[in-house]
Amino acid sequence: MNLKALRATAAERLQPGDVYAGEVTSEEAWQILEAESDAALVDVRTNAEWAFVGLPDLSQLGKEPARISWQVFPSMAENANFVGDVAASGVADATPVMFLCRSGARSRLAAIACAAAGNTQSFNVIDGFEGPRDGSSHRGTRAGWKAAGLPWQQA
């Protein structure tokens, strides 16, 4: 799929009233990261998730994911400095940025916040790093970054 069509599909997935650029799958996020040299991935999960579940590995693209928690572990209070932390990581307002969490919920909130602050190219990775639970209540097998076979590493 070309990037123009991919972006159009991502925008079509938005819920009424959403103001960010779109909803992309993990595979689509990878395509954007691969095709656009300035595109960035912000992993909004917690330190515990990065340490125990793993991280996307963007090394073959010459990139690293920015690790900026949307919620701070263990209290899970919202990171009041999130938008500023994203800007401090080098993500400019016009930079295509993919926000990733476990399953697409926290990353959606992150995309909304950054879009409201001026980044018109904020995307939510809808299936997350691990995706939904399967019939055995395990994550990482039905959808998401890991299930798609995209590169990842244990932290």
Report the location of each language-model feature.
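Short, surface-exposed ligand- or partner-binding patches at beta-edge/loop junctions that are enriched
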Residues: 99-100
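Rhodanese-like catalytic fold shared by cysteine-dependent sulfurtransferases
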Residues: 1-40, 47-96, 107-155
